[in-house]
Amino acid sequence: MIRVLLVEDDPVIRDTTCYFLKSQQNFEVVCAETGGDALSHAREKFDVILMDILLPDTNGVDLCQRLRSWHHCPIIFTSCLDDTDTIVHALEMGGDDFLAKPYHNKILLARIMANIRRVQMDGAEPSVNGYHCAAFTLDANSHSVEKDGR
């Protein structure tokens, strides 16, 4: 199951994207309308986060930096602001990809899968508690390694 956190304040885009992703096999989508809503889901495990840059209560780039303390999964920014400076800033501040609005859902799906594939090719799966690979868990925050939960 691919878990997606969708952070989007525009109800039409949020509902359309959510419906499209849920129609795909093995997708579970959690929707958040604001940065505060997204933070309430911060400790849950997600495979990818889709986030608008312009949110009513915060800037998506700032939210990205806060979510990075819990998540190492790919963060894909979406925005109608598609100038070079905005895109570069979003990527430099922790985003993994950027998709300008309006976007085609098939392109969004391809970007999601490409970003997930990139993480899987690293041989480790990101999670809320760190990286898991075989019997090992690496927690970058505490600089510790566990084998079989010990």
What feature does the model see in each segment?
Residues 1-122:
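N-terminal/domain-start alpha-helical segments
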Residues 3, 114-150:
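Short, Lys/Arg-enriched segments at the junction into DNA-binding effector domains
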